[in-house]
């Protein structure tokens, strides 16, 4: 279910402050965040965020196509080891 339009997009308050500080600072600085639930806003375009995946921070460079999505969509939490190989096919 989508979020109501009258509520607007959800963004943690500290995230806006960090984004403003990153705009004034150096360009290659990674802003570490733990808020995977926050929506990416147009003012975040061009900033690299380090989105926490439960283990480490994954660098995510925000582009215009990402606006409206959540930060958690770009930082996978699980690693896929691949399907187990068939033992019969492996012996041949």
From Swiss-Prot:
Transmembrane segments: none annotated. Protein S19 forms a complex with S13 that binds strongly to the 16S ribosomal RNA. This is Small ribosomal subunit protein uS19. GO terms for molecular function: rRNA binding; structural constituent of ribosome. PANTHER family: RIBOSOMAL PROTEIN S19P FAMILY MEMBER, SMALL RIBOSOMAL SUBUNIT PROTEIN US19M. NCBIfam families: rpsS_bact. One of its GO terms (biological process) is translation. Keywords: Ribonucleoprotein, Ribosomal protein, RNA-binding, rRNA-binding. HAMAP family: Ribosomal_uS19 (MF_00531). InterPro entries: Ribosomal_uS19, Ribosomal_uS19_bac-type, Ribosomal_uS19_CS, Ribosomal_uS19_SF. Pfam families: Ribosomal_S19. The keyword Transcription does not apply. One of its GO terms (cellular component) is cytoplasm. Belongs to the universal ribosomal protein uS19 family. The keyword rRNA-binding applies.
């Amino acid at each position: 279910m989508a979020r109501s339009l009258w509520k607007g997009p959800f963004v943690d308050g500290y995230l806006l402050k960090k984004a403003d500080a990153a705009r004034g600072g150096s360009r290659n600085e990674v802003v570490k965040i733990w808020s995977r639930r926050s929506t990416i806003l147009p003012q975040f375009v061009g900033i690299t965020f380090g989105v926490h995946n439960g283990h480490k921070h994954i660098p995510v460079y925000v582009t215009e196509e990402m606006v409206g999505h959540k930060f958690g969509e770009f930082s996978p939490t699980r690693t896929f080891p691949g399907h187990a190989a068939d033992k019969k096919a492996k012996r041949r």
